[in-house]
Amino acid sequence: MSSSSIEDIKGKSHRLRGSLLESLANPTTGALGESDQTLIKYHGSYQQDDRDLREERRRQKLEPAYQFMIRTRTPGGVITPQQWLQLDAIATRYANHSLRVTTRQAFQFHGVIKRELKTTMQAINAALIDTLAACGDVNRNVQVAANPLLSRAHADLYTDAAHLSEHLLPNTRAYYEIWLDEKKVAGAGEEEEPIYGPHYLPRKFKIGFAAPPINDVDVFANDLGFIAVIVDNTLLGYNVTIGGGMGTTHGDPDTWPRVGNIIGFITRADLITISTAIVTTQRDFGNRTLRKRARFKYTIDDRGLDCIVGEIQQRAGITLQPARPFVFEHNGDRYGWIEGEDGHWHLTLSLPAGRIADTEGSTLLSGFREIAQLGIGEFRMTPNQNVVIAGISPGQRAAIDALVTQYGLDTGNRAPTALGRHAMACVALPTCGLAMAEAERYLPDFNAKLQPILEKYGLAEAPILLRISGCPNGCSRPYLAEIALVGKAPGRYNLMLGGDQRGQRLNTLYRENITETEILAALEPLLGRYQQKRLPSEGFGDFLHRTGIIALPPYPTHRHVISSTLQA
């Protein structure tokens, strides 16, 4: 759909109402009307179909097996045990019997059919969780560092992020009328949208809060990032980054991924003001005529960083202070038990591509249900698609450990390679309409193919960062990985190499449109050289750059955040 069509739909939608009620009530199809397929995204859902069944249903002269993905708005991915049980029940009753943890710390339900869409939405809201603005041209789910060590500062970080998430919600009552049966009042459909305006943003907008030395949120991949400045366990404020983004288009030189620029420091008191100024700057300056160039990163590249920063400061009435020193050491999760400063313990468990389900070889859904039934602590989803069972007292650990062992919840932690423990993949086939190749379903097979090569060169415990994406939109943040596969066609991928383990450098296209056999053949000699010639503690991506095998990608944009400029 063209940019003009989408802008027209938004403008005529009566603040995101459209004809959704009529589409939902239409019994002759499992789909929504065309314009409503756009509008439902703002309510937290995508219309999809089971692509595994497309050809068979076409032969039977049936419409596609339409279904809906629903995504939660859970800032920082924090939920209570009771909420976990409610989401588990929803997944079992209305979806495909699985919970999917996303790279933005939300949950996705897949396989919901239209006639149960409203009931499912109501059940999610009954858990005191909503889906408003989880998709669409608005601010999406706000990421927050899942850092269990700095307990007090992390609590303040989460409070700020949750406050900002609420502040940036659309003002329309459409969500509550359509899904929760709120009565319309005079003026419904004409509510003021003081932040978004009648056409909302040109494209989606993503925000992340990071807590050094860990960059688990990949803060430089966000349109707007906040890097916590913590001194003596007190959160003083944030270094602000703008202009990150992963999406691109295969073969189009006018699109590219980008890492954000650090533009200065703010105190906590200025968080809402500066964020509003940044979002409204993108609202007014972003490209609404060419959708593939509508993200904030292109607004900055087209108009210039100095111009955009000047506009932000003018709107906010704030002069940004010089950025404070900080260092990121890595962007992964730390598995196993970790003690926080307050004496509580936190258990991080690695999930295969974020999928929580009971399958022939796994009882993850049942196991986490049993832990939630204990009613202790809380659950935190990580930006790496994993789960933290957080806030556990020393005396409660044994009960958790027993269930972890019984249900094999730490199987991911015990994966035979470090690469496998840290790898990520987007959902891709069969539900994502944009997928060109497999990702989540392919990840375990590809890990298994890489394992003997890694073991051959003594690299089984080398923390090499692998990410797989089914298309170039990059939901798994592949362009920051040391090794990335980006889908081109069924069974074929672009092989990207040379990111780092800190989320600060874009990788580079190494081989284009190649098969698994060709990917493994390309990687083996590089891994062999890495084993022989790497420096102590040198990452694979850093090695590729130091030895000249890989250079920065030729994008006309910001490609690398230099660590030396960030240190005192």
From Swiss-Prot:
Catalytic activity: hydrogen sulfide + 3 NADP(+) + 3 H2O = sulfite + 3 NADPH + 4 H(+)
Residues involved in [4Fe-4S] cluster binding: 426, 432, 471, 475
Cellular component aspect of the GO annotation: sulfite reductase complex (NADPH)
Residues at which siroheme binds: 475
Keywords carried by this UniProt record: 4Fe-4S, Amino-acid biosynthesis, Cysteine biosynthesis, Heme, Iron, Iron-sulfur, Metal-binding, NADP, Oxidoreductase
Family: Belongs to the nitrite and sulfite reductase 4Fe-4S domain family.
Role noted for this protein: Component of the sulfite reductase complex that catalyzes the 6-electron reduction of sulfite to sulfide. This is one of several activities required for the biosynthesis of L-cysteine from sulfate.
HAMAP family attached to this UniProt entry: CysI
Protein name, per record: Sulfite reductase [NADPH] hemoprotein beta-component
Gene: cysI
